[in-house]
C-alpha cells in the first residue's frame, strides 16, 4: 500500500487522504484502479501517457482489472508514505483525480468523480 501512495502523490499533505481512499475501496471490495500500478506493469515501454488500452493489460499489477493490492511493492517508499499507510485519513471519499498541478480532487460518489475527471483531465 505504501508504495502505491508514494507513487500516487508528491503532496505530503494528501498521502493520508489517498491512503484512506484505498482502505475504503478495499473494505468495499472495490478495485483500487490506480495508475501507478499500471505504469509499473507497463515497465520500460511506458512513454509518459496512460491510454485507455493500457488499463486493460493483463498483469497482476493492473489494479483496474485485479482486486486487492499488487503482489509486490511498486516502488521504494519514504517514511511519509509508510506513515500514511498506517494512519489513513477517515472519511467517505472513494475517488480522486489529478488536478494537473500535482494535487488531487477527492470525491465521495462516482457521479462527482466523473464531473471532476471532465473538469481536470478532459480539457
Placement of each model-derived feature along the sequence:
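Bacterial extracytoplasmic/cell-wall-associated proteins, especially those involved in peptidoglycan
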Residues: 1-123
